[in-house]
């Protein structure tokens, strides 16, 4: 039987725990709209990382991105979503306001500067030049936050990020699901331990219990606190082992094999399937783009001069090694992290489920410029991948 104070404390602890659990599951929710004639998927996102804001009229779909300098790169493809033009905007920080887009006018402001871009961040879209007015409408962003409680895919690390990057492979989705499952048990254990601690502090303080009762031994309670933790650990261990073994599964006949070689301080990639006896090969070095050379829309310390282009929805094998010291090839959205050891070949298998650009970094301290070894994976359609390979080989 709980006293009123205990009931009050337990009630609030349970409320906070449930809210925390719901917030974790909320991070995996996506609301997807229909496709337009341009073939680009429309999403609705409403947190401060990305927003899809709606404007009326017209028959174009505008895709805009903010980089960390609060500038905008514009992407335009034909087609509408239910007769409504959509604008996809990436907001760099919590204090940034929402924007509404309309065509045929052009203005330049410090926080909404419009720049034409031909980046391949949005695959399969027809990039065209167009002038568009960006009008500040903070009411729109607040309204969207209240109406649609979803968040955007996060394929690169963000400032003050608390959760995982969104999964692009079955392995990463399994990691996120396992985290949520374990977090449920952690909440229950935390609530129980907090209740026991607060109850002991309240009922056994010196005023209420001046002569303490000393308990030397209790068989029942010792059995209970041995059995229950063991059962909880079993519930945690079984799915953990299943996920661990699935991460070690190697595809016997992968569609594409890529070799990643770590150097101080850059990566070299070789597409082994396209090497032949005529000394024709597909290989390149991938260096980080210096901050002074970044174009608008590119991410600081994450962009490279040559991306690793792979087809989406295809079984891939990546062979990883090093030419000098220890490195580690890691891409969080793909759920992969593999050490690059000199004189040894490690391999991982992955299956990217959606098109996009995924950022990673070397995750093993390898010297002075360890922080300047980014990894960029661009997953495109099979058709675009074939065109890219043809252009590289020829």
Swiss-Prot record:
Binds a dinuclear copper A center per subunit. The chain crosses the membrane at residues 182-198, 227-243. Keywords: Copper, Electron transport, Magnesium, Membrane, Metal-binding, Mitochondrion, Mitochondrion inner membrane, Respiratory chain, Transit peptide, Translocase, Transmembrane, Transmembrane helix, Transport. Its cofactor is Cu cation. Belongs to the cytochrome c oxidase subunit 2 family. NCBIfam families: CoxB (TIGR02866). This is Cytochrome c oxidase subunit 2, mitochondrial. It comes from Glycine max (Soybean). The lineage of its organism: Eukaryota, Viridiplantae, Streptophyta, Embryophyta, Tracheophyta.
């Amino acid at each position: 039987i709980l006293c009123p104070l205990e009931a009050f404390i337990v009630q609030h602890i349970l409320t906070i725990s449930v809210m925390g659990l719901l917030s974790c599951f909320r991070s995996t929710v996506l609301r997807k709209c229909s496709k337009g004639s341009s073939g680009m998927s429309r999403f609705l996102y409403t947190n401060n990382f990305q927003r899809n804001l709606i404007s009326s009229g017209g028959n174009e779909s505008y895709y805009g991105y903010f980089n960390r300098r609060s500038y905008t790169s514009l992407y335009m493809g034909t087609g509408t979503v239910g007769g409504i033009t959509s604008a996809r905007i990436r907001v760099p920080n919590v204090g940034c306001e929402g924007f509404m887009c309309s065509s045929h006018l052009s203005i330049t402001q410090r926080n909404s500067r419009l720049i034409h871009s031909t980046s391949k961040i949005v695959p399969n879209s027809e990039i065209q030049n167009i002038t568009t007015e960006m009008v500040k409408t903070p009411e729109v962003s607040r309204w969207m936050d209240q109406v649609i409680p979803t968040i955007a895919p996060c394929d690169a690390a963000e400032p003050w990020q608390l959760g995982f990057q969104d999964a692009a492979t079955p392995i990463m989705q399994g990691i996120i699901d396992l985290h949520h499952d374990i977090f449920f048990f952690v909440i229950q254990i935390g609530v129980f331990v907090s209740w026991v601690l607060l109850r002991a502090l309240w009922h056994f303080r010196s005023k209420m219990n001046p002569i303490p009762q000393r308990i030397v031994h209790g068989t029942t309670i010792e059995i209970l606190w041995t059995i229950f933790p063991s059962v909880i650990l079993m519930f945690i261990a079984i799915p953990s082992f299943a996920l661990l073994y699935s991460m070690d599964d190697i595809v016997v006949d992968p569609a594409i094999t890529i070799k990643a070689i770590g150097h101080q301080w850059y990566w070299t990639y070789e597409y082994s399937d396209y090497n032949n006896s005529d000394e024709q090969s597909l290989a390149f070095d991938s260096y980080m783009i210096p901050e002074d050379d970044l174009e608008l829309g590119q991410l600081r310390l994450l962009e490279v001069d040559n991306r690793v282009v792979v087809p989406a929805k295809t079984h891939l094998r990546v062979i990883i090694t090093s030419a000098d010291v220890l490195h580690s090839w890691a891409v969080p959205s793909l759920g992969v992290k593999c050490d690059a050891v000199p004189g040894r070949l490690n391999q991982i298998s992955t299956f990217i489920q959606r098109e996009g650009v995924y950022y990673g970094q070397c995750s093993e301290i390898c010297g002075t410029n360890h922080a300047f070894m980014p990894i960029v994976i661009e997953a495109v359609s099979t058709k675009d991948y074939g065109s890219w390979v043809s252009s590289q080989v020829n």
